[in-house]
């Protein structure tokens, strides 16, 4: 489970007249984010709505905050306990400052609801992914009534209509194009915490991307739980745009140079989607396509809706359209009833397909899902051994991809200073590899050709094309 703390620079010129505090004394906002890129996007929107309505500025120190929010993820086991552990760490701040507002959002909030307040009565607001736009009203009602507020309803796409215009500082941005999931995989809580699939109107998505491009964004990542299941209404015509059509239109927006998307589902990888990789050069040569397992028996128990052979067929068609395409994926090891033969079929699929860096986990039982009722007799040590074997194979494949990039010329979008050396720069290749290289700050936010000189475990090192060769090998 990924974990991030939302930070943002000071107000833009357009915010110059916004007061830093309100009549209620609000001033600073701290958000801690767990989980996927959808949650990162949602956290940005929480900050946007509270800045617009109450003038809150982000801080990376919870002790300075007037509002503390936890944006939670329920994909992994013990997610709820993690939330209560984090809440316990800020409880003393509530005692020091009774006016402090503490809120819990995201999928754990959606799943647990009022149970959070019962267990942690110092929590002021609980809200779901679909009701984050109501945060200002929830906080105001909490202050006016003195009672904790809980809103975990599913008002479909209402939140997108209520959100302020996007505001970004860099060359990359996320754009949520749909919410929820209607696949109901037997192991997954997402349909229960984020609702069923609802797509944003076609024009709304294009307007947001165009707005971001006007702010200097060059790369957009289109987000959805099953992003390629997008079916957006086109104005009042009654026509529906599929994901391939949306990609075609985003591709034509001036200023946008790269398009990414996540997360996709193999069942929704239509021929029109495959053809997009042959026709749309701005669509990057990288795809995250979760397969979960390589055994048809396990895939059926997971209710994934495809076989291993059908998954391989999708991959073959994609690579025929874009030979340079690299794939990452998700794998669950130790699903209830998984035998050694089932596991070896997953290993065979990995060998046959070839994956870049991927996400793999031992199965986590999620209460309320169909898989939670399945008999699980595989010892934990066996599951851990299988996970280690699977990760070793994927790491080997990822290392081979990285080694194969040495000496190649890569188009890199420079995102900022290197995390390892602030005097150097960091950017990403099309296939989502981080590259660190010497360069001047004026390159930040621009596309640069970089020659890869060294491959490391989690990054590459290179030099700007045309600059004398870098031989340091520093990571």
From Swiss-Prot:
Pfam families: Radical_SAM, TRAM, UPF0004. The keyword tRNA processing applies. Keywords: 4Fe-4S, Cytoplasm, Iron, Iron-sulfur, Metal-binding, S-adenosyl-L-methionine, Transferase, tRNA processing. GO terms for molecular function: 4 iron, 4 sulfur cluster binding; metal ion binding; N6-isopentenyladenosine methylthiotransferase activity. Its cofactor is [4Fe-4S] cluster. SMART domains: Elp3 (SM00729). Residues 167-400 form the Radical SAM core domain. It is found in: Cytoplasm. Binds 2 [4Fe-4S] clusters. One cluster is coordinated with 3 cysteines and an exchangeable S-adenosyl-L-methionine. Residues 27-144 form the MTTase N-terminal domain. Residues 1-10 have a biased composition (Basic and acidic residues). Its EC number is 2.8.4.3. [4Fe-4S] cluster 1 binds at residues 36, 73, 107. Its main location: cytoplasm. Residues 403-466 form the TRAM domain. One of its GO terms (cellular component) is cytosol. Residues 1-22 are annotated as: Disordered. It catalyses: N(6)-dimethylallyladenosine(37) in tRNA + (sulfur carrier)-SH + AH2 + 2 S-adenosyl-L-methionine = 2-methylsulfanyl-N(6)-dimethylallyladenosine(37) in tRNA + (sulfur carrier)-H + 5'-deoxyadenosine + L-methionine + A + S-adenosyl-L-homocysteine + 2 H(+). Monomer. HAMAP family: tRNA_metthiotr_MiaB. Belongs to the methylthiotransferase family. MiaB subfamily. Catalyzes the methylthiolation of N6-(dimethylallyl)adenosine (i(6)A), leading to the formation of 2-methylthio-N6-(dimethylallyl)adenosine (ms(2)i(6)A) at position 37 in tRNAs that read codons beginning with uridine. This is tRNA-2-methylthio-N(6)-dimethylallyladenosine synthase. It comes from Bordetella bronchiseptica (strain ATCC BAA-588 / NCTC 13252 / RB50) (Alcaligenes bronchisepticus).
